[in-house]
Swiss-Prot record:
It is found in: Golgi apparatus membrane; Cell membrane; Membrane, Caveola; Membrane raft. Residues 131-142, 167-178 are annotated as: Interacts with SPRY1, SPRY2, SPRY3 and SPRY4. InterPro entries: Caveolin (IPR001612), Caveolin_CS (IPR018361). One of its GO terms (molecular function) is transmembrane transporter binding. The gene is CAV1. It is a peripheral membrane protein. The modification Phosphotyrosine is found at Y6, Y14, Y25. Its main location: Golgi. The lineage of its organism: Eukaryota, Metazoa, Chordata, Craniata, Vertebrata. This is Caveolin-1. PANTHER family: CAVEOLIN, CAVEOLIN-1. GO terms for biological process: caveola assembly; cell differentiation; negative regulation of endothelial cell proliferation; receptor internalization; regulation of cytosolic calcium ion concentration; T cell costimulation. There is a cross-link at K5, K26, K30, K39, K47, K57 (Glycyl lysine isopeptide (Lys-Gly) (interchain with G-Cter in ubiquitin)). GO terms for cellular component: caveola; cytoplasmic vesicle; endosome; Golgi apparatus; Golgi membrane; membrane raft; perinuclear region of cytoplasm. It comes from Felis catus.
C-alpha cells in the first residue's frame, strides 16, 4: 500500500493510502494520484486565517456592529456643548474598543477552548448517536407503519366512509324570518 493524495471540495490535498486496485474511498485512483502528486498537500488543521476580514460569513453584521450614533443621539433642538459631545464620542469609542480587547485577551482563548469542546461533543453525538438512532428508528417504524396502514384500511376507512355517506344527505335550509 502506498500513499496518495485526496482532493477535498475546496481543492486542498490530503494524503490517503492507495492500493494497487485503488483506495477504499476512490477506487482506481492510482492514475489520478500520480497526476496530482506534484501539488502541495494541506492539512485541515493548519489552514490560513484572514486577519483582516475576521467575519467572512457576516455572522455579526446586525448584532454587534454598534457605533456611538446607534446608542446615543440628541434630537434637533436639544444639543449639549460641542466639546461634551466630542468627548462623549471619544470616550464611548475608545472604551468600547479597549474593553473588548481586554475581555478578548482574558477570556478569548478559554472561551474558544470551551466552544471547541462543545462543538466537538455536539459533532460526536450527532455523528455517533443521533443519526444512527434516527436511521434505526426509521427502519423499525417501517414495519409498524405497514401494520398501522393495514389497520386503517381495514377498519377506519370503511367506518368513516359509512359515516360520510350518512351525513352527505343532510341538507340545511336557512330562512330569515322578518
Amino acid at each position: 500500500m502506498s500513499g496518495g493524495k485526496y482532493v477535498d471540495s475546496e481543492g486542498h490535498l490530503y494524503t490517503v493510502p492507495i492500493r494497487e486496485q485503488g483506495n477504499i474511498y476512490k477506487p482506481n485512483n492510482k492514475a489520478m494520484a500520480e497526476e496530482i502528486n506534484e501539488k502541495q498537500v494541506y492539512d485541515a488543521h493548519t489552514k490560513e486565517i484572514d486577519l483582516v476580514n475576521r467575519d467572512p460569513k457576516h455572522l455579526n453584521d446586525d448584532v454587534v456592529k454598534i457605533d456611538f450614533e446607534d446608542v446615543i443621539a440628541e434630537p434637533e433642538g436639544t444639543h449639549s456643548f460641542d466639546g461634551i459631545w466630542k468627548a462623549s464620542f471619544t470616550t464611548f469609542t475608545v472604551t468600547k474598543y479597549w474593553f473588548y480587547r481586554l475581555l478578548s485577551a482574558l477570556f478569548g482563548i478559554p472561551m474558544a477552548l470551551i466552544w471547541g469542546i462543545y462543538f466537538a461533543i455536539l459533532s460526536f453525538l450527532h455523528i455517533w448517536a443521533v443519526v444512527p438512532c434516527i436511521k434505526s428508528f426509521l427502519i423499525e417504524i417501517q414495519c409498524i407503519s405497514r401494520v398501522y396502514s393495514i389497520y386503517v384500511h381495514t377498519f377506519c376507512d370503511p367506518f368513516f366512509e359509512a359515516v360520510g355517506k350518512i351525513f352527505s344527505n343532510i341538507r340545511i335550509n336557512m330562512q330569515k324570518e322578518i
